[in-house]
Amino acid sequence: FSVFSNSYMAVIGAPLALKYARYSNDRAESFRIRTEILQDEKGGKTVRKYPLSKEAEAHVRHMAEAYEKLKDRYAGSRLDVNVCHLGEENGIPYAEFAFVAGRPLSELMDECLDRRDVEGFHKLFAEYLERVGYGEDVPVADFDLIFANILVDGDHWTLIDYEWTFDRPIETRALAFRAVYCYVLEDERRNALELDRILDRLGITENEARQYREQEMEFQKYVTGQKLSMGEIRNLLGGEVYKPT
């Protein structure tokens, strides 16, 4: 570090409670939030989500409502829903979640693919379908039930992020297709996945897969307010490396 930097910043005082912060500010005004991980003096951690605008306050409050509805839907299942409570700080509401132990399901799936354990991957996928599909006909569903939003700790699977919960039933196969679609897009190493086998398992035709992809594009427009997200901007710019002459 000393080789590349000729300056530094020293913070003097008690340890900061804030350990991590992420800004989701490439969204529509009504969905912009800040996510924080806080640690108390005893080492206990909590997660908080704050609105970044007055318009986003309703979105944050909706998270607590989503928790209650999803908790009821998955009562008796083998999928836990991370606890959420509403709080207020300087007149600004926030949603507070427990800090859950475990590893993202996506990491466990990656390990299967890295060691070419295809059957291990599909075993985890089958477990995902069984757990998230509980109460499929109930008129509430988390549209963003991707693998990275589930933490696995032994036999305990916990849904940790459910801000995109809607008051309508959504077919499990639609949620699963989106989870796989997002999973593959996030890392090119995952292109080795046998998508045809997954489509067959879900009973999804090529035409239906195309429709689901179009729905995903519409959802992203809904989230970003028709604006380009940072990920979309990066894709448009490309990754070319220019050598100076």
What is each residue range found by the language model?
Residues 1-36:
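Rossmann-like AdoMet/SAM-dependent catalytic core
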Residues 45-46, 93-95, 156-157:
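Hydrophobic residues embedded in beta-strands of well-ordered beta-sheets
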